[in-house]
């Protein structure tokens, strides 16, 4: 029995392959344009990016290295030298490290005494205020309110106006007497301090790379640091500096700083390239003048007699040294190298995008390049004629199969007496035509 013709028109649905589009590989379409202006600009920008990435970011700035920007450090300082002063208040006095260095144990901040003003044997009592103090001069007692004390006063007013000397009358105060004169010596008393030497020992550690190094030469010679002086080329691992040279490198004059004091900053910077080993890590020293005036007061107390405390007041002028240690260490790493190269590749992509914008929107032939670069592909639509053509081909195939079966030899009786059945009706005529249909389904 032949299959019915009603099923002859079934067709494969386009949706039968739905889902396989996710596995398709899509590639870009490249259009070669003969526009020398945009082409030259693209090559110029690409060349600049390659030079920047390779020459500057990768090699000059060592973009292929991992960085440790937080070093751990320790500092030990020592000052060496002696000086002698001859003044009326103290007589002949020798000054050594314990006298002119504050604090004497050596830290990253210390003070070198270069000048001083001494007021010996002060005891608490009543005495005239110094005329240089604001509101200290007076004519009558009413000019000195009792209990009043000013910001710059040496004590508290007693309410009396007394004679200071032959030319001045000042308010009497309760204070450490006699009061400080306030007259600074005309020349530094410790002028020999410019020949003192400063030893700075610094050890830096980069824990990220488990690396540690000192700025002082490792030597068994105990006299090496007694004779050497720092020179960047000849003795970079001898951190011994002459004070006068150090102040000059900071941009100051020792005589000026020694008179009224000042502040000098010393920076020790480590820039270590650990790819070259220990030889690629050494310190750089720089000096900066921070202040041109610095002083403070200190006193030595004792008991002059039972119940009477006395002191010697020193107003110290000198140079304060602030030592700052900074540093960084670098070593080759795959991640920073990949990041640097990836950044360069991204910039090359930006150049291509920029040139596309010029070509498609700015160039005189932009409309032509637009039509060439972008194409619209539309899927063909199914029409009535194509559907009926499919049905006709399927019907003819089924008719041929039916005729082949009907022309087969007659069946013979079998042993059981049964025989093969013939088709129940004749095949359709070969000249039977499907009705034509125009228009869309």
From Swiss-Prot:
GO MF terms, alphabetically ordered: ATP binding; channel activity; extracellularly ATP-gated monoatomic cation channel activity; protein-containing complex binding; purinergic nucleotide receptor activity; transmembrane signaling receptor activity
Q: What residue spans carry the Low complexity bias annotation?
A: 410-424
Recorded catalytic reaction(s): these are:
Ca(2+)(in) = Ca(2+)(out)
What keywords is this UniProt entry annotated with?
Cell membrane, Disulfide bond, Endoplasmic reticulum, Glycoprotein, Ion channel, Ion transport, Ligand-gated ion channel, Membrane, Nucleus, Phosphoprotein, Receptor, Transmembrane, Transmembrane helix, Transport
Bridged cysteine pairs (disulfide)? 127-177, 138-161, 144-171, 228-238, 272-281
Per the similarity annotation, which family is this?
Answer: Belongs to the P2X receptor family.
User: What does the UniProt entry state concerning the protein's domains?
Assistant: An uncharged region within the N terminus of the P2RX6 subunit inhibits its assembly and exit from the endoplasmic reticulum.
UniProt name for this protein: P2X purinoceptor 6
The scientific name of the source species is: Homo sapiens
């Amino acid at each position: 029995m032949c299959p019915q013709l009603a099923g002859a028109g079934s067709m494969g649905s386009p949706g039968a392959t739905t889902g396989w589009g996710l596995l398709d590989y899509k590639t870009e379409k490249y259009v070669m344009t003969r526009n020398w202006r945009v082409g030259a600009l693209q090559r110029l920008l690409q060349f600049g990016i390659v030079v920047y990435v390779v020459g500057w970011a990768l090699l000059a700035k060592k973009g292929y290295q991992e960085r440790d920007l937080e070093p751990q450090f320790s500092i030990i300082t020592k000052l060496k030298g002696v000086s002698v002063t001859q003044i009326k208040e103290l007589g002949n006095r020798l000054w050594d490290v314990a006298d002119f260095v504050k604090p004497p144990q050596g830290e990253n901040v210390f003070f070198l005494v270069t000048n001083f003003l001494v007021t010996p044997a002060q005891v608490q009592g009543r005495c005239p205020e110094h005329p240089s103090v604001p509101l200290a001069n007076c004519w009558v007692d009413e000019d000195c309110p009792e209990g009043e004390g000013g910001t710059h006063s040496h004590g508290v007013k007693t309410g009396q106006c007394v004679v200071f000397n032959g030319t001045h009358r000042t308010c009497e105060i309760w204070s450490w007497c006699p009061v400080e004169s306030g007259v600074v010596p005309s020349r530094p008393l410790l002028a020999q301090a410019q020949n003192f030497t400063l030893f700075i020992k610094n050890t830096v550690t980069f824990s990220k790379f488990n690396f540690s190094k000192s700025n002082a030469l490792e030597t068994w010679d105990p006299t090496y640091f007694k004779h050497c002086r720092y020179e960047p080329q000849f003795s970079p691992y001898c951190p011994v500096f002459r004070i006068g040279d150090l102040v000059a490198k900071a941009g100051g004059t020792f005589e000026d700083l020694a008179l009224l004091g000042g502040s000098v900053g010393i920076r020790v910077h480590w820039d270590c390239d650990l790819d070259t080993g220990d030889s690629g890590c050494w310190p750089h020293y720089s000096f900066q003048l921070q202040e041109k005036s610095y002083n403070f007061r200190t006193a030595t107390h004792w008991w002059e007699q039972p119940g009477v405390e006395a002191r010697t007041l020193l107003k110290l002028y000198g140079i304060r040294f602030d030592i700052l240690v900074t540093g960084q260490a670098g070593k080759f790493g795959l991640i920073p190298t990949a990041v640097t190269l990836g950044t360069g590749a991204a910039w090359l992509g930006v150049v291509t995008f920029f040139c596309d914008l010029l070509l498609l929107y700015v160039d005189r032939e932009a409309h032509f390049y637009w039509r060439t670069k972008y194409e619209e592909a539309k899927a063909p639509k199914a029409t009535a004629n194509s559907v009926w053509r499919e049905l006709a081909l399927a019907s003819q195939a089924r008719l041929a199969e039916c005729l082949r079966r009907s022309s087969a030899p007659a069946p013979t009786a079998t042993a059981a007496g049964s025989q093969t059945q013939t088709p129940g009706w004749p095949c359709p005529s070969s000249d039977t035509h499907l009705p034509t249909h125009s228009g869309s389904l």
